[in-house]
Amino acid sequence: MMRTIKDLKSKTSSMESDGVYIMPFNPKYEKDELEERMLKVVEEQPSVALRFLCLIGDYKVGTSKQYISQIIDSNDIPSLGESMLIASPTGSGKTSAVIKMIKHTSMPVIYVTNRKMALCQFKKDDIKASKGLDVPAELLDSISLGENIIAITYQELAETTYKYKGKKHLLILDEVHCLLEDANFSVYAEKIIRYLKANRDNIARIYLTATPDAVTPVIAEIECESGQEQALFAMDWDTNVKSVFHAYASYKTRLKMVYSMESNWNYINFKLYTPDDTKELADYIKRENEQGTKSLIYVNDISKGKVLQEVLGNTQHIYSDEDKRAEIAEIAQNEKFSDRNLITTKVAENGVSLHDDELNLIVVETLDPITLKQVIGRARVNRKNPREITVLIPDYSMTDIGNAIASAEQQMKMVKEVKADPDLALEYAAKYPALVYYDSKVKHPVVNTMAEKALAYQIAFLRGLRKDPEKPHAFAQAVLELYGKKPVISDDMFLYYDRILDFKTKAAEAFDTYKNSEKNAECLDSLKAKLKVACNSTKVYNDGKQLTSNIQISTVNDILKAAGIAYEIKAKVEVFNISSV
């Protein structure tokens, strides 16, 4: 019988003998002590992804009202060859804590992040903290922080790693989840991973992220000395306890400390909108603007952003690091945007702090849970007394999710084919340019294996949404669970709540008429016609698709169920007897 971590919690006994556990020759904990430590880690560490790393190293978990600097000793800086992970929510003070640590180290520092806007903001904060100066926005992009501090993007580091090879320094990897998040459209993550693995002895590393779930296995792999396969298998404690002991026995890591914080998302209210109904979304944002609310709008598709720009009017937009440098620097400097709305893509979804009490509406159009959390985190709130924020998320249909799976699986197919034969990358270059890069040192193409990891994570998440094809609002429910809320979708969560009420009213009136009728074929046809009108006029039923043909009784009953009517219509079968004439 396998013993799970749930069994450990309830002290359920196991039929496995002690002999199956392979412990280190000189373990830090004996078997019984390790079992108790597992219980302690489960109780104290809410993030499943972080538990294994907490088990094998040291860790501290702060409360939802603390800031990360309250639990980190600024002198507790990793030694050369070692690392630490700071995994805490957006707005918990990770940047401030890092700036304090930089002041306490004698090592040269390289700070990296993945977006120009986030880089400008770090420079502003560092200069303010170290020199007490407010730097003009137009200088942030080009300013230097001094001889011992270099602040660059991951993309810049990836192209200049030769400058730092063999040199001793402290490397601060902010927004480290980007190594997975960006791997599908860029090869820089693959280059960074290779640089880290090749230079572990001469650099100290601090990893920072607000979304550790997907990237934690990547960090564990980079920092692993031995037992990598067993460790990665045991990182999800839904596996049996034996595998955790095996992993503990063989896994050695350079990661010495994990800092994390509890989250409190009670200040966030989620609402759902139809991704194809731009007018409905724009009308809602306009109404909120009229009430004095600002909105941050994240879109995957620039063309949709342009449509929203035109409809909303009073709107800033940033779709590229290169074409809006002055505007990016100004937002980083002021920690707010000037217009009522800011429409953006991945340019501003990471690392940017927006301290603006009028920013109380966020729209996030994505199927990626990492991106979603990062965008929501741009609006900074007081951790002790947060203001209420409304977040609009798309109510993706099963068709939308299925299309996303098909697209990701097609990309995965190309990745695996190129992995087997890198020369195929030329064939796929137009469709998927981030598959490989040419390594001038080894003089052959290098496959972007991080893209494979990113796609595997994405596909697993999307497939999880389709476990029950009949389950409506699967993505929205997953988001609610991600934020520790009950996965219950109520009518008032929809932007089209008025249409839902209209649909239910029309369906109820049609059913009441039928209920009080003779219930013959003519009455049934009348009911079907009225239900079709209720569905087609409100676009609430069947993902808004129009009902054009004659509907069957099964569809009638499904519509009644959707309208909250607890009745079914069943055909009465008449039997005609035969007798002799």
Predicted regions and their residues:
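The feature captures the C-terminal accessory region of ATP-dependent helicases
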Residues: S69, P78, P89, M101-I102, ...
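Conserved helicase ATPase motor motifs in RecA-like P-loop NTPase domains
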Residues: A87-S92, H177, I192-I219
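SF2 helicase catalytic motif II
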Residues: K165-Y195
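Conserved helicase ATPase core of P-loop NTP-dependent helicases/translocases
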Residues: E322-T344
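Conserved Walker A/P-loop ATP-binding site and its immediately adjacent core
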Residues: A97, T105-K128
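Conserved SF2 helicase motif VI
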Residues: D368-I389
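Interdomain hinge/linker at the junction between the two RecA-like core domains of SF2 helicases
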Residues: V215-E280
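Conserved strand-helix element at the start of the C-terminal RecA-like helicase core
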Residues: P108-L119, Y284-E310
